[in-house]
Amino acid sequence: MAKHDSHLRCSFCNKSQDQVRKLIAGPGVYICDECVELCNEILEEELYDGNTPPATAPAASRRETPRKSSRSLPSLAQLPKPREIMRYLDQYVIGQEKAKKVLSVAVYNHYKRLAAKANPNSLGAAELDEVELQKSNILVIGPTGSGKTLLAETLARMLDVPFAVADATTLTEAGYVGEDVENILLRLLQVADMDVEEAQRGIIYIDEIDKIARKSENPSITRDVSGEGVQQALLKMLEGTIANVPPQGGRKHPYQDCIQIDTSNILFICGGAFVGLEKVIEQRIGKKSMGFIKPGEQLAVTREQRLADALKALEPEDLIKYGMIPEFIGRLPVVATLDPLDEKALEAILTQPKNAILKQAQKLLRMDGVELEFEPAAISAIAKEAYRRKTGARALRAIVEELMLDVMYEVPSRRDIKYVRITAEMVERRSTHELIPHPSTLPKPESA
């Protein structure tokens, strides 16, 4: 038997087991340690191409060595100023002037802080060299459909940084059914093509943050795993920490190597509608509705104005009474409140932004060689119906999509249609089957 073992050879290089350090046996084949090393070198050259640390390096060093970023951090002189950020936001977001100003200043200061860390000698004043600039995360409060997510998306697009959106309602404490808070960082990492350095200067928008308010003002003896427990889990991430992020999600693959991400340079924007917050504010300031209100439209305007006035008097203690823990509110020092959208604002949203819904519909039809026109009365009718639905700007797209269904269906197949006009009557009937062809395309009457 020993004689037979001495003639075992590598199936690739044909060296005997006496000529190599290790011979690995498989089902009918053998491979030596030298061939394994050669295969490893080939894989490194072809697959990694120098962007990832070698597989032979320790796991810790592979996690901590980020891929070289394709986009460098702009210098202080290259950063867009708050006025420039505001002008850019004006192109996509209608109204909300106070919120846009607050966000412009907060975002500028955040990335100015990153530029100062990258270029510490650019400050000039020696007495300020030891001053540490701390991060200021942002809390955005406003009714549904008022533009909270749109503001965050537009800021990220202007600054050309990775941007990820997370839903707070799916988060739970570690060990319970649901998503871990580290999955938020995983989304940002995926948007940055797994580039750690790039992800560490990105923006994360956490939506529905009001849904993780604790169920009662007083701490409970039972665990609140999707409310206060999530707030506690988010504290260190918001403040800045080295987080271990599982690249495939932590629950289904518990034994994978984690990627380390420093969250101290990531800007967190938390948004929520905070339904009922105005009642908490009014209770604090002792304001009560008195007298009689006529039914109908005046009631809606009064409720809208009541919400806007209440948010102007917002204090941190109101958010704490609502169910947010003090430590969580303390890590969101910048607060921007958005006003409810009235009919006039909804009309402007339909037509003024660069990506306005009506402009998108006109462009789609123009690709089929058809001009689309909305009468002013039709635009007002769409805004009025959207306001009635009480879902903010989101209702506009739903109404326009429903209204344009017949047009989008008929136009590509009909060469006689070169012009379509949408009237207020069509909006009220939710139907556009009466297509209006351009006079030049109508058949000419036969001469006698």
UniProtKB/Swiss-Prot annotation:
Region (Disordered) location: 50-76
Source organism (scientific name): Synechococcus sp. (strain JA-3-3Ab) (Cyanobacteria bacterium Yellowstone A-Prime)
Keyword Cytoplasm appears in the UniProt entry: no
HAMAP family: ClpX
Record's protein name: ATP-dependent Clp protease ATP-binding subunit ClpX
Keywords, comma-separated and alphabetical: ATP-binding, Chaperone, Metal-binding, Nucleotide-binding, Zinc
Residue ranges constituting the ClpX-type ZB domain according to the UniProt record: 1-51
Pfam families in alphabetical order: AAA_2, ClpB_D2-small, zf-C4_ClpX
Binding site for Zn(2+): C10, C13, C32, C35
GO cellular component, one term: HslUV protease complex
